[in-house]
């Protein structure tokens, strides 16, 4: 739970410099049909960290020296989604990240 707790704490409380230290130099983010490099992703995450955004219902699914998998809930345009994030780790840092959103039907 060490890395999971770290990510939740930094995303909810900052500072952004902590997140930067967790992101590998070779980092790539895959989202639906797009891809971001380290600088692009950190820029987007910086906006979240510096706003009042918070993880909602973060849930750890798996964590070991190779992978960190968790999900959380987001509301977008009045619809509720479960976002699952799969982080492949290299040298103790997030190296590849992929997310998937699943609509939650009440």
For the regions a protein language model found, what residue spans apply to each?
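Short, well-ordered alpha-helical segments enriched in acidic and aromatic residues
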Residues: 13-28
């Amino acid at each position: 739970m060490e890395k999971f707790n770290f990510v939740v704490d930094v995303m909810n409380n900052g500072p952004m410099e902590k997140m930067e230290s967790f992101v590998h130099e070779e980092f790539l983010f895959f989202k639906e049909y797009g891809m971001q490099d380290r600088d692009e992703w950190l820029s987007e995450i910086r906006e979240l960290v510096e706003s009042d955004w918070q993880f909602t219902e973060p849930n750890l699914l798996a964590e070991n020296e190779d992978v960190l998998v968790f999900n959380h809930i987001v509301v977008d345009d009045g619809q509720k989604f479960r976002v699952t994030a799969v982080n492949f780790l290299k040298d103790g840092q997030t190296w590849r990240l992929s997310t998937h959103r699943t609509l939650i039907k009440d």
